[in-house]
Amino acid sequence: MSVIRIKTNATVVAVLPASEDQADYPSTFFEGGNEIRLYVNKEEKLDVLRQYVYMGLVEKNCKIQHVNAYLYAVLKGERELLEADWDSFGHKIGIRGEKIGPFNLVRVEDIPDGLPDGKLNAEVSAEDDAWLPLFLLGLYRVGRASETAYRTLLMESLIKQCKAIKSDWVSPVTATHKYFDVWGNDGNYLKIVACVDMFYNHFKKSIKATFRWGTIVSRFKDCAALATLGHVVKITGLTIEEVFTWVLQTEVAEELVKMMKPGQEIDNSSSYMPYLIDMGISAKSPYSTIKNPSFHFWGQLVAALCRSKRALNARQPDEIDSMSISNASLLMAYALGSSPDIEQQFSTGDTYRKPPKEASYLVSEEPKSRSVVEWIAWYSDVDNKPTDDMLMMAKRVAGTISGPRDNSVGKWIKQTYG
């Protein structure tokens, strides 16, 4: 984009510094047959790795290289039978009738440099392979939790999972330990986590699917804007197409269009797509709230005004057109609340028949349907401003909110309409 300097008639190119990385769509990674690569030490014996990891947990200095090598060694033999061909983004994972394992999802390459030294413990045996992988994968979920009470709750749940396998087991780790938090910075550990979750998400009936307790947070990581869309569909009872028609604000629409880029396998439950971050497919998710702040705020505000408690805790993004988005959200929530989709579904013989709808020439009269066209026409007739009834509805919602989190949608509603 350029402008003209009036005094000199010179052309000036108007640019701003690049403030952030561009989002990477998952399909882009696989162009040209690119493969996901996992690097682990494949040479050390499982018995030795098991002891290294166990003693590392006991002494609170467990090395991530040992963890990765152990998880690969103990899980590489797991096999499940494919009932149908499995492929994603043109990459053939397996064919019908084939037995495959978690690491068929990636190309595994050996790290030839060897492993750091570790300590041995002869009392650790193959029996510990029943709980140790679950525990190591579970620490990923615990390590992502920053809030103390929630972290403690997760650790207690993980310990219960392991005790269900070995009743006399005593955890060598507590929620107060932090050394394993940094494992989430290791790309190979993240790929192992993603492989396990993607594999057992596909084979949900497997006895080892319990390993997903810790890995499930890898699925749709940094895809919160997609979760927002799903929540709006659920809380409003509209179809996804109907939700789209209620998007009345430009920035929200533009972000939604970017999220809906074709060919990304969003609706394929067995795709690599949900693991775009931990598999290393995308450095920056196009489905995050950071990339879609206006849509995220719009969707969560609609849900909150429709009395969703979960939406109240959603983060309030900075530097967006909050008031314009708020008005659009309020109109949608008010319209849905004023025209509930209620009609007789079953009958013992008597059925209510709706009388024919009488034509009305008064646009200022509130619509009785959920038609977005009728509501936009009505809103235009009231000068495109929230009416007293709309504001009263929002005020009632604000009145139900107590102690909202700072910088949350609930806080915004309380301050704006309370």
From Swiss-Prot:
InterPro entries: Rhabdo_ncapsid, Rhabdovirus_ncapsid_C, Rhabdovirus_ncapsid_N, Rhabdovirus_nucleoprotein-like. Keywords: Capsid protein, Helical capsid protein, Host cytoplasm, Ribonucleoprotein, RNA-binding, Viral nucleoprotein, Viral RNA replication, Virion. GO terms for molecular function: RNA binding. It holds the Pfam family Rhabdo_ncap. Gene3D superfamilies: Nucleoprotein, Rhabdovirus nucleocapsid protein like domain. It is found in: Virion; Host cytoplasm. It comes from the Viruses. Its main location: virion. GO terms for cellular component: helical viral capsid; host cell cytoplasm; ribonucleoprotein complex; viral nucleocapsid. Encapsidates the genome, protecting it from nucleases. The encapsidated genomic RNA is termed the NC and serves as template for transcription and replication. Nucleocapsid assembly is concomitant with replication, therefore viral replication depends on the intracellular concentration of free N, termed N(0). All replicative products are resistant to nucleases. Homomultimerizes to form the nucleocapsid. Binds to viral genomic RNA. N in nucleocapsid binds the P protein and thereby positions the polymerase on the template. Interaction of N(0) with the P protein prevents the uncontrolled aggregation of N(0). This is Nucleoprotein. The lineage of its organism: Viruses, Riboviria, Orthornavirae, Negarnaviricota, Haploviricotina.
